[in-house]
Amino acid sequence: MSRFLICSFALVLLYPAGIDMYLVGLPRIAADLNASEAQLHIAFSVYLAGMAAAMLFAGKVADRSGRKPVAIPGAALFIITSVFCSLAETSTLFLAGRFLQGLGAGCCYVVAFAILRDTLDDRRRAKVLSLLNGITCIIPVLAPVLGHLIMLKFPWQSLFWTMAIMGIAVLMLSLFILKETRPAAPAASDKSRENSESLLNRFFLSRVVITTLSVSVILTFVNTSPVLLMEIMGFERGEYATIMALTAGVSMTVSFSTPFALGIFKPRTLMITSQVLFLAAGITLTVSPSHAVSLFGITLICAGFSVGFGVAMSQALGPFSLRAGVASSTLGIAQVCGSSLWIWLAAVVGISAWNMLIGILIACSIVSLLLIMFVAPGRPVTAHEEIHHHA
């Protein structure tokens, strides 16, 4: 079992590493490529677009051909495009490389969640996804620090070579450690089981909405945090970095505590707790009389996301044994596109950073609480749990 956990964690971590590690080198990248920093900030969106594009096909391929045939090319593409970005001499080539890099990371991301669906029962999967969420929270803190240390002695290209090395490690794990987990195709007489795993299932759709809104909350916070903390609250850059590190610490602590909480409380209880924390954060930020109270509201956001997201993802994947890849892709596409659409629309309409965050917090909590209360899970699928045979 440990091999599947190690491989899944490694496959997922390419996604945040590809986002956070290069940011520290952005000024030098812009100077070398004769582009403005503003022009290269689109590299973040381009990378996410590549991930979303990968999710359109990766899940279906993983369900038909297996997890390894998607993970291996995905990791290989991530390696090649990381090297390509390091060799780019124009901003156009750099952005093209970033799109393809996101494509590779997206393939790996989809496979990771499909593997966990294949090999873990509902309760263990919820615990593991909570741990994975905590580990993912470490990357936005550690990646820029690692990037800064690398750039003390090496040029910005070394950041992408470091990503390539990470990709090589994932490729080696996928080739030699990971074993195939895709369940055997059902016999002709059992096709009804495959047909019953519909993406239009009410319970699955409710969890898609909940996880998409939750991701929208956390990404809205990340995107608006410089404005909120430095422009509105007046913190210095160093203080901003410290606050963000502390919020990551809150996320990690809650994420690592959630598996223990699942041994005491029902998953539904933790999901309700998550949304109540979001609602409390929205109210706190609305009526906040001081910066200290506002910072407390921000910690509630991080705690709320960490306590509920892994559980919601586990529940979303629960009904799917034969279509776990497609389900994982659907979740990923909805989360990436839904959160990006909200942030873009809010910016176009001219909603302030403060109101943007408060609005999504309150909307997420109200909609999600209603869905948790009134959309119950169907009959669990368990026949495929614990893979004992591998292709």
Curated annotation (Swiss-Prot):
Q: Does the keyword Cell membrane apply?
A: yes
From the Swiss-Prot or TrEMBL record, state where the protein is found. Answer: Cell inner membrane
Return one GO MF term.
transmembrane transporter activity
One GO CC annotation: plasma membrane
Q: Does the keyword Ribosomal protein apply?
A: no
Topology: which residues are Periplasmic?
25-41, 90-92, 152-157, 222-244, 290-292, 352-355
Name by which UniProt lists this protein: Multidrug resistance protein MdtL
